[in-house]
Amino acid sequence: VLGRVIDRFTDDGLTPVLAVELEFYLVSPRRARDGSILPARPAGGRTPTGVEVYGLRELDDFRPFFDDLYAACDAQGLPLESAISEFAPGQFELTLRHKPDALRACDDAIMYKRLVKAIAQRHGVEATFMAKPFADQAGSGMHVHVSVNDGDGQNIFASAAPEGAAALGHAIGGMIGSIGDGFALFAPHANSFRRFRANSYAPVAPTWGVNNRTVSFRVPAGPPAS
């Protein structure tokens, strides 16, 4: 299906540019007495607690895991970039570099997900990409960064005008119109819907906005080079 869509872009002289971000938790292979999931304990023995978003210590606690993950991704040609700790204990996100090959970018995301799970097992923990593994903690999502380049390599969505580029408006309108059908792919499980709640950085309506993390389709603001 994606291949046919890309062919239609190619026929119009356009190239989709794509990157995928996947949030995940590192959790203990043991379970609590009630069967609930427990956060992973790093080699140093410190149990993560509280919101530790963007914390460096949280990354350093699991440094052996991340070192092996980066090495494995490099060996398989996966363009892994920055790593951050997220909004809950043991939750992380690593970014894959943008590619002017949407099909390969999606394949990279699938391969990366398998690698994360395999490397986690090697370090005695488990990685879960479940949308809502903890009822009282942040959910995990997948962010897809999309732009479209013309034949000269220029982003047709970019514009310095306050109202933005017309092509961007059409793209957003099309995605909003198809978001209902998209749930079959983007929220395929009962657990997926546990993440959709107000004030949780998960969208609860077919909306869009500029630099607004609560909407379904976010237009990031940035310098012209971005």
Q: Which ranges hold each PLM region?
A:
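Glycine-rich, acidic/polar active-site loops that bind/position phosphate-bearing ligands
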Residues: 1-226
